[in-house]
Amino acid sequence: MENIQTKQYPCFKRWSRKNWSVFASLHRYVTIGVLSVGMSILLLATQGASAQTADTTAVLKTLRIREVGVTGSQTAPARNAQSHTPLFDRKAQAPAPVQTLEAALRLAPSVDVRERGGKGTQADIFIRGGSFDQTMVLLNGIDFTDARTGHQSHALPVDLDCISAVELIDGVPGVGAYAGAVNIRTAPLRPTYLRLEASGGQYGYGYGNLSGAVSAGRFSVLGAASYRRSDGYRHNTDFSNYNAFVRATYDGGRAGFFDLQAGWQDRDFGSNGFYAAYNPDQWEHTATALGSLRWLKTAGRFSLGAAASYRKNFDRYDWTRGTAMNRHNTDNVGAKLWADCDWAAGVTTVGGDYAFNHIYSTNLGDKLSVPEGHYTHAKARHTGNLWLRHAKRWRHFDAAASAGVSLTPYGTSALWSLSAGYAPAAGLRLEAGAWQSMRLPTFTDLYYTSPAQINNLDLTPEHAVTYRLGMDYLKRSWNLSAQAYYRSGRDIIDWVWREDMGSKWHSEQ
């Protein structure tokens, strides 16, 4: 060991993607041999780094350090993000006997996953007392939340073997993440592989999955397809589910970094008691197609990023199986543009995002003068956010603030967030933050009417201010985390039983 020269361990001093501050908080030198683009930008499998020949470093000691999420502003879901709480990690939870994402998320104390049926047939995600409609759902940092109902937001065409991690993101101000955001990250099991899985069980259960990945130079692709079905464990609980997903990345050098993902899902399921406990004969069929393209470019202290996304969702709901009651055709389009500048006073980010939501339906939206096929109603809306964020880090202290505006059909609202962190000793970090968030009424909140429900066109956005205090302590093999939250909300939307309206449910605030 005494013959090893100091020059063999290059000390980490700066990362061109700016968010090197997470390493600075460790108060240790970080030795890195090869840092792959996949790890630094997209948090893909870290095998890309280990596969290289690290001939410029010598490994002297293996240290367990605090787990950090390397997320620069280019991967932030929207506006600003204050903290990332791991909900699922592929390596850490590999021994856990889980077969679906829903089963894995049930192990996390910060979220409440409520399933209808088995094997992820239909599930809702609740964050810290919020509703499923108040949860933003992201896939690799791209917002694919459904504007019609939160019941559909979680229906993403990815299986557990493609998911490397799931994280809870706090501190996203503005429209969308009223209670928080759940970000699902995909990555291959290894740089190049082909995997086949098949299983079966009682009640006609069967599952088949084919997945694989290829990496060649600056290009990598991950693909997967699966089929899951069952005859059901009781009357009208059968289901079938098809998934297909592909993600490709390419480092174009001066042209920038490109990240493309696309997926398709088709599922139908008997809905015995799903939406009305007294009706065992409900049935639903949904089909989802989604895709996104993200571009990242760095030039010196400046960086620029852009993303575009699209999600289409079809839904057919039968109150009595075989007799169509509701049909919906939803389009969700998103675009985002942001720029960073790393200068002496910190990192400044300016950006904006835009969302377009449109629905054709048999009963949601304004009545059409001329029907479009089965659809007699339609509605569209545009929303956007503009924001400015600045962050600064010192040796033991860091702070960030953001401000901007949300533009919605209901008017203009201010958005803001504040956060600070302090590391008084090695392994100990204290955090505090506050942010404003809001949620627009879904198309279901506004328009849904049935023999048991009455809609409300006078609904307005929900608003909340959330406060957070946190502490994290790591020493050797021990890790202790504690967090306290307080959310002050107003104009909360819920369905209320009204006897004066004919004993029906009414959407109110």
Regions from the PLM with identified roles:
Residues 142-171, 185:
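Short acidic/polar hinge/loop motifs at secondary-structure boundaries
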Residues 102-142, 164, 171:
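Extracytoplasmic beta-strand/coil segments of soluble accessory domains associated
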Residues 165, 173, 180-214, 225, ...:
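Short strand-turn segments of transmembrane beta-barrel domains in outer membranes
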Residues 275-298, 423, 429, 436-490, ...:
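Outer-membrane beta-barrel signature, preferentially recognizing the C-terminal barrel domain
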